[in-house]
């Protein structure tokens, strides 16, 4: 069980051991409830057909919300980044989840991400601005430059400001930093 917990992101050997020992001390019905919740989440949660965010419905709550601006599209690497931006309550547009970042060293090319769907979406919809909210790293910069080249013929492209430390992950940034990063976005040259 410890080995399984260690496979989770951000869980080291000591935390994995602590979690395993905690579960072993729980009543059997609580362990069954926990296991059932995991299995239910895995079988009931998929991806939104529009933005590729996690959703129990074919179209997620954000994409269905008529109060969200259809003219603004924020591109993120994964759902954790989307949730981090949502916590700021500063952004009222829609999203597109790539499913990762271009990383040739890890064997991840553009064709492995939701990039072709993004280009089709931007070309077909009335999107006035695409905001690239990608981690400030080599992979994030590479992906941003690649996307900017593809999307500029269709719409304005900006990137969130570099208020985030280089090499950091979006999901760990505090709400104020993310809010300022959104406010300070600029056009990609």
Curated annotation (Swiss-Prot):
GO terms for biological process: DNA recombination; DNA repair. SUPFAM superfamilies: Recombination protein RecR (SSF111304). GO terms for molecular function: DNA binding; zinc ion binding. SMART domains: TOPRIM. Gene3D superfamilies: 3.40.1360.10, 6.10.250.240, RecR Domain 1. A zinc finger (C4-type) spans 48-63. Residues 71-165 form the Toprim domain. Keywords: DNA damage, DNA recombination, DNA repair, Metal-binding, Zinc, Zinc-finger. The keyword DNA repair applies. Pfam families: RecR_C, RecR_HhH, RecR_ZnF, Toprim_4. Transmembrane segments: none annotated. NCBIfam families: recR. May play a role in DNA repair. It seems to be involved in an RecBC-independent recombinational process of DNA repair. It may act with RecF and RecO. Belongs to the RecR family. This is Recombination protein RecR. It comes from Synechococcus sp. (strain CC9311).
